[in-house]
Amino acid sequence: MNKHYDFSYTQDRELSWLKFNERVLREADKKNVPIFERLKFLEIFTNNLDEFFMVRVGSIHEMSLIHDDHRDIRSDLTPEEQLDEIAKHVRPLYELRDQIFAKVSKELEQKNIIRSKIEELTKEEKKKLRSYYEAMILPVLSPIVIGKQHPFPHIPNKVLQIGLLLKKKEKISFGIIGLPRDLERMIFFPGDGRRYVLLEDIILYYCDDLFENYSVEEKAVLCITRSADINPDDEIYESTDDYRTHMKKIIKMRARLKPVRLEFEGNDHKQIKKYLSMRLNISEQD
């Protein structure tokens, strides 16, 4: 690269894309946009960001391992510098998304579309919810305590999990529960089509009972995003399979690639985050 090149006239492609996605997000904050369209913009922003981490961030991660001295032709940044800049730009976008979602949720509450907190339900509502949990959710849960009998499992890409920090006789363990994919995520109250509880909130509320003889020190809803940086035309993936079979194999491989992002809901997860970052070999800022 020419050392006299003025990089102020060009911009890193990934940072430019994040600015574009921010404009998508800000559409959700416009009062003149119908409320369900605002929810749609929030969904588009989130889906865009998922794909960005899977493909673009995944690719830069790979580049940082193979060619750590490579410099981007538009910004003169190394892969590590690009990842640092992406992290700096993404964090405020998450905060903005949460702020906008909180506003939209408040407006939905005025229309009686309410995400109920289990702690605030009446005794009768809790009784019905407990019955639903025991009949429909509990039978399909597969809780695991990581240890000699259960080594650290493969955590699927973009599937919500409940992570728990467990304590038994001063020994700390890690537990995990995958959210069942076949169940509806929004559970509406009978006879009331607008008040609902999320599936993960129900499991999070009752999951202590699944770990007998343990005390639950921390618990949180989490999600892992894995790199999807596979080129189906690369020679190492060539085969004699028909194209459909070949692409199915590629999709399966994408599901097992390196984690590039670790997301949590809420704030009570400091030790869980530290443990998973170590086990998944991922920076705590990712």
What is the predicted role of each segment?
Residues N2-D286:
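N-terminal non-catalytic structural scaffold regions of very large proteins
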